[in-house]
């Protein structure tokens, strides 16, 4: 019988099975205050059918520690339910779930698992006969989830290409399409030389680098895609491009038929207004499109022959007809006052936003009234602390509206909240949920201290990854005060997890790193609590505190997630900890001191191609390290943990854990006869070609 833990919320009776323990834990620890707590009375917890009625909102609260107690059939049912409902789990949930699935031997059922989960799987366990099916499904996932696992992202690319190329060196057009979202890591030269049908995959990319955008425009300009040459593009064809159309250059827009371009402009404005297209992408398009219209290539007459009226502002093509200079000279203050919301629905360029701000200052010299403040979300970033000091903010709704923008408001957040607090406002859990963890990062220490503990508890798990170190210190102290009496260490960890970090996730920590986040004493306590910390949380810990943890502490802290150290060894936090260890200790882990070392402790005679001359590269996205933080070039993903010195140093219970986790810690060289070993010796030079015989590259060294 699983032991019940004390959790916030309604009192729960004795738990009858580990499956029910998990279900109730999920309900109690969902990220939002609306999480549902289910009664055990109406559920049959004896089998896998327990998960048949679990809904999406409940499953979003998935937590690995109680899931590790599930029998194999219930864990399998849970994973399949997650896939069926397309539950959007976060990286920290997926990484530990992948390790649980691997430990229970469930990876062979990958066709029934969520594509995002496959990104985290141990690739050496995928059978050669299944590799194409595995890559096809994994390529449907979001590779940005691997931002904290740079080496796993590298390994996934190498595995995919090794599988698709096989014994040959040519990557066919169909193979390129099979890469799915993985093509988001292709370098510019590869995109420019890729099969035109590659556009279908590039649509999956959340963003493209500047070089990739240039290559995309080169591909489109060639006229060999399904759209044809720019002069023959249609509205339907542009809409089929999806977000890729927002990267089209002004030079290409100037070649598009005017009626088609204007029709697409209208559709972008409409999509943005209803939330189908993000503000950032839409503004990128508008800027490019309007730039093309400043050149004398269009025969359209200028329509700005008189003052701007309310009817003019309702036209989706308003920005095409009026530039920012004409906006300043033709917009009357009275029209602006009564039609401010309509005007700001347009994706105004920065210059035009400054024009509107200046006109509002003329209309309201003593500061904007509160009813108007709720309309200027897109302009808030332009206001100084002094200007915000003139505002009167009495409503929580006004605060939510002002801080709802997706732009950085480092200087505005504190000022807006201060005006609200001056009118006896309070920072509630609902407000924290509405403005998100990013805004919490920019509150002053005093404002953070005014948050009532219960409100912080109601806010749930906020994303604090972008917080500066000084705020993380304050937030950790506040959260520790709030959750310090949560009962067991496991319950405490669930609530404290977002606040344990000491440096922004995925970024190179400053040197020296200011003290903050969870101190080493707390990390040691957590290591003995069987929490199995996920690798995302681990990489966000203060690197200076980690230096005081030995191999035993870290192994116990990560539990069944210890294998993820290899997947994240190039992450700055992990790399710094590895460098603090001596060579003999590293040998116990099967790792060398430097992730960029050309040699490693576990080489086989066969394996993936040598990366010294490898033409496959990875794009350095925001989540990937650069320069000295590149991934391992040793040709070995991992070495087994079954070393005698480590066995002698660890307790029996931990050895059992590592024994079950050994399948995660297998060198790629050990499967040389499989799909990762089909490339021959790594001693030579190998080039993978596309369908036309050109080298296929990926930016960054593998």
Curated annotation (Swiss-Prot):
<keyword id="KW-0130">Cell adhesion</keyword>
<feature type="topological domain" description="Extracellular">
    <location>
        <begin position="36"/>
        <end position="638"/>
    </location>
</feature>
<keyword id="KW-0812">Transmembrane</keyword>
<feature type="transmembrane region" description="Helical">
    <location>
        <begin position="639"/>
        <end position="668"/>
    </location>
</feature>
<feature type="signal peptide">
    <location>
        <begin position="1"/>
        <end position="35"/>
    </location>
</feature>
<comment type="similarity">
    <text>Belongs to the mesothelin family.</text>
</comment>
<protein>
    <recommendedName>
        <fullName>Mesothelin-like protein</fullName>
    </recommendedName>
</protein>
<dbReference type="GO" id="GO:0009986">
    <property type="term" value="C:cell surface"/>
</dbReference>
<keyword id="KW-0472">Membrane</keyword>
<dbReference type="GO" id="GO:0016020">
    <property type="term" value="C:membrane"/>
</dbReference>
<dbReference type="InterPro" id="IPR026664">
    <property type="entry name" value="Stereocilin-rel"/>
</dbReference>
<comment type="function">
    <text>May play a role in cellular adhesion.</text>
</comment>
<feature type="glycosylation site" description="N-linked (GlcNAc...) asparagine">
    <location>
        <position position="424"/>
    </location>
</feature>
<feature type="glycosylation site" description="N-linked (GlcNAc...) asparagine">
    <location>
        <position position="122"/>
    </location>
</feature>
<dbReference type="InterPro" id="IPR010335">
    <property type="entry name" value="Mesothelin"/>
</dbReference>
<keyword id="KW-0732">Signal</keyword>
<dbReference type="GO" id="GO:0007160">
    <property type="term" value="P:cell-matrix adhesion"/>
</dbReference>
<keyword id="KW-1133">Transmembrane helix</keyword>
<keyword id="KW-0325">Glycoprotein</keyword>
<feature type="region of interest" description="Disordered">
    <location>
        <begin position="588"/>
        <end position="611"/>
    </location>
</feature>
<feature type="topological domain" description="Cytoplasmic">
    <location>
        <begin position="669"/>
        <end position="702"/>
    </location>
</feature>
<dbReference type="Pfam" id="PF06060">
    <property type="entry name" value="Mesothelin"/>
</dbReference>
<feature type="glycosylation site" description="N-linked (GlcNAc...) asparagine">
    <location>
        <position position="307"/>
    </location>
</feature>
């Amino acid at each position: 019988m699983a032991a019940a833990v004390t959790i916030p919320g309604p009192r729960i009776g004795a738990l009858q099975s580990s499956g029910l323990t998990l279900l109730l834990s999920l309900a109690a620890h969902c990220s939002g205050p609306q999480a549902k707590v289910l009664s055990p009375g109406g559920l049959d917890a004896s089998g896998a059918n327990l998960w048949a009625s679990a809904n999406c909102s409940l499953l979003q609260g998935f937590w690995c520690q109680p899931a590790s107690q599930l029998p194999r059939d219930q864990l399998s049912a849970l994973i399949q339910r997650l896939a069926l409902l397309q539950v959007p789990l976060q990286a920290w949930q997926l990484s530990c779930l992948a390790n649980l699935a691997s430990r229970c031997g469930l990876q062979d059922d990958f066709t029934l698992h969520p594509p995002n989960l496959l990104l985290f799987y141990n690739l050496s366990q995928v059978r050669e006969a299944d590799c194409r099916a595995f890559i096809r499904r994994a390529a449907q996932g979001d590779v940005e989830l691997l931002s904290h696992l740079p080496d796993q992202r590298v390994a996934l690319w190498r595995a995919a290409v090794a599988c698709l190329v096989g014994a040959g060196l040519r990557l066919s057009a169909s193979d390129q399409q099979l890469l799915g979202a993985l093509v988001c890591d292709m370098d510019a030269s590869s995109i420019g030389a890729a099969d035109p049908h590659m556009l279908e995959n590039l649509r999956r990319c959340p963003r493209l680098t500047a070089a990739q955008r240039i290559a995309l425009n080169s591909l489109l300009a060639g006229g060999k895609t399904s759209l044809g040459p720019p002069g023959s593009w249609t509205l339907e064809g542009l809409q089929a491009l999806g977000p890729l159309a927002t990267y089209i250059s002004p030079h290409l827009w100037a070649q598009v038929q005017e009626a088609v371009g204007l029709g697409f402009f209208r559709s972008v404005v409409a999509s943005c207004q209803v939330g189908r297209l993000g503000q950032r992408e839409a503004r990128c398009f508008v800027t490019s499109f309007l730039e093309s219209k400043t050149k004398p290539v269009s025969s359209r007459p200028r329509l700005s022959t008189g003052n701007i009226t309310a009817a003019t502002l309702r036209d989706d093509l308003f920005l095409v007809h009026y530039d920012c200079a004409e906006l300043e000279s033709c917009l009357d203050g009275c029209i602006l006052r009564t039609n401010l919301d309509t005007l700001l629905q347009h994706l105004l360029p920065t210059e035009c936003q400054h024009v509107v701000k200046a006109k509002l200052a003329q209309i309201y010299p003593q500061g904007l009234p509160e009813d108007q403040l709720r309309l200027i979300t897109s302009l808030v970033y332009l206001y100084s602390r002094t200007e915000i000091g003139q505002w009167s903010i009495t409503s929580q709704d006004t605060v939510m509206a002002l801080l709802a923008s997706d732009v950085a408001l480092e200087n505005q957040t504190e000022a807006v909240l201060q005006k609200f607090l001056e009118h006896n406002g309070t920072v509630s859990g609902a407000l924290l949920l509405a403005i998100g963890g990013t805004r919490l990062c920019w509150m002053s220490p005093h404002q953070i201290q005014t948050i009532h503990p219960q409100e912080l508890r109601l806010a749930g798990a906020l994303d604090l990854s972008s917080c500066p170190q000084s705020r993380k210190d304050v937030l950790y102290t506040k959260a520790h005060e709030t959750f310090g009496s949560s009962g067991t260490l496991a319950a405490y960890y669930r609530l404290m997890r977002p606040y344990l970090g000491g440096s922004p996730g995925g970024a190179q920590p400053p040197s020296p790193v200011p003290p903050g986040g969870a101190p080493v004493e707390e990390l040691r306590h957590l290591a003995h609590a069987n929490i199995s910390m996920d690798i995302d949380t681990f990489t966000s810990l203060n690197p200076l505190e980690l230096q005081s943890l030995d191999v035993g502490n870290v192994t116990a802290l990560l539990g069944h997630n210890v294998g993820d150290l290899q997947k994240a060894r190039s992450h700055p936090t992990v790399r710094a900890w590895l460098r603090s260890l001596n060579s003999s200790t590293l040998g116990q882990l099967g790792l060398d001191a430097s992730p960029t070392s050309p040699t490693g402790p576990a080489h086989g005679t066969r394996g993936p191609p040598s990366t010294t001359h490898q033409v496959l590269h990875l794009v350095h996205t925001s989540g990937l390290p650069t320069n000295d933080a590149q991934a391992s070039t040793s040709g070995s993903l991992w070495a087994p943990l079954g070393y005698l010195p480590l066995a002698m140093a660890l307790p029996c219970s931990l050895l059992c854990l590592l024994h079950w986790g050994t399948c995660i810690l297998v060198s790629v060289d050990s499967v040389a006869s499989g799909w990762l070993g089909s490339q021959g010796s790594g001693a030579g030079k190998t080039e993978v070609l596309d369908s036309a015989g050109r080298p296929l590259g990926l930016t960054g060294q593998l």
